Curated annotation (Swiss-Prot):
5-phospho-alpha-D-ribose 1-diphosphate binds at residues 78, 103, 130-138, 199. It comes from the Bacteria. InterPro entries: PRibTrfase_dom, PRTase-like, Upp_B, UPRTase/APRTase, Ura_phspho_trans. It catalyses: UMP + diphosphate = 5-phospho-alpha-D-ribose 1-diphosphate + uracil. The lineage of its organism: Bacteria, Pseudomonadati, Pseudomonadota, Gammaproteobacteria, Pseudomonadales. Belongs to the UPRTase family. Its cofactor is Mg(2+). It comes from Stutzerimonas stutzeri (strain A1501). Keywords: Allosteric enzyme, Glycosyltransferase, GTP-binding, Magnesium, Nucleotide-binding, Transferase. This is Uracil phosphoribosyltransferase. PANTHER family: ADENINE PHOSPHORIBOSYLTRANSFERASE, URACIL PHOSPHORIBOSYLTRANSFERASE, CHLOROPLASTIC. Allosterically activated by GTP.
Amino acid sequence: MPIREIRHPLIRHKLGLMRRADISTKNFRELAQEVGSILTYEATSDLPLEHYNIDGWCGPVQVEKISGKKITVVPILRAGIGMLDGVLSLIPGAKVSAVGIARNEETFKAQTYLEKLVPEIEQRLAIIIDPMLATGGSMVATIDMLKKAGCKEIRALVLVAAPEGIAAVEAAHPDVLILTASIDERLDEHGYIVPGLGDAGDKIFGTKQKDI
């Protein structure tokens, strides 16, 4: 299933702001949520609908509601938390499954340290969120985990993706749709996306930002 790069003008503008070296923690957090919300809008555009009747102000009226599978949002900790509020602003009824995966900075391999999936996840559409798709190790490990739990329909939302990470996910899980705000140039020798956003987790949580 091909990757989709969402080139909406609002996304292009907000992503440009996020790439600034001098961006504040507050602004980066807010923009991550906003772009996450727009990606969610795109990722749910094909959800099935069903009709039902309600009492309107002038009498009975037929309206629509989302039908089919319920949704679980799966942030990859810790950086995925930075997109969560933006996603839930559009699908507030979704349940949250948390996955903790850290990257070994020497081998770039993914190491799982937390798995908290909602009950009956096999009956849900899983939407994975993570700001960066770099080597693809964390994303592949998360998809492996979800499929092992019985989840059959999975989508992923990332702010920025590297070609290397896209290739890794497509090779391991060609059935998973990835939506991104930008397909960037490459990975550097340290496994960071170029031009990328820097360390999204550090920027979201203010790890290295100076106190004001």
